[in-house]
Design a protein with these regions (language model features):
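Glycine- and hydrophobic-rich flexible loops that cap the catalytic core of alpha/beta enzyme folds
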Residues: 2-165
Length: 165
């Protein structure tokens, strides 16, 4: 847990559904946090965790990992103190799903797939356009520009790896 000066505050300590957590309000990763650093081992563990949820049909409750949030009293922003790698990876996965749903919608005129793509965008990633930058996760440091350009902007990354098909 964090300790610090008068602008530090504990939000809560409870279990929250991932969808509610991500779509609640904007999250920030402080500038002092290390950059995104997960490698294949951590990504494999993340994927295995997701597959286990799917295979065991555990949809209601599953401990997805600890996330520590600090709500700064001065600027009112919610900063991720611990759990940034898992949250960032989740947003990357959601971007892949958003892109795949959009590809399905475009190639088959499937309105449900298009709606799913739009829902992911609106609820978890944010609306990004020339006039709007409403991303729900604002990275810090060296990752900020890359994450915005290649993950949060719709369709910026070409996911051609067969692992995602």
């Amino acid at each position: 847990m964090c300790t610090g000066g008068s602008n530090m505050g504990i939000i809560n300590s409870n279990l929250t559904k991932l969808g509610s957590f991500l779509g609640n309000e904007k999250l920030y990763i402080p500038e002092y946090q290390r950059g995104y650093s997960w490698e294949e081992t951590q990504l494999d563990d993340f994927w295995i965790d997701l597959l286990q949820i799917y295979e065991e049909n555990v949809r209601d409750e599953h401990f997805f990992g600890q996330v520590v949030i600090h709500k700064n009293k001065e600027d009112g922003k919610r900063y991720i103190i611990d759990g940034q790698q898992r949250i960032s990876t989740t947003i990357i996965l959601l971007d892949i799903l958003r892109t795949k749903f959009k590809e399905i919608a475009d190639s088959t005129n499937n309105n449900d797939a298009n709606d799913d793509s739009e829902d992911i965008n609106a609820k978890y990633i944010g609306r990004i356009s020339d006039s709007k930058k409403e991303q729900y996760l604002s990275m810090g440091g060296v990752d900020k520009e890359f994450f915005f350009e290649y993950v949060q902007k719709r369709g910026a990354i070409d996911y051609t790896d067969k692992k995602f098909d």
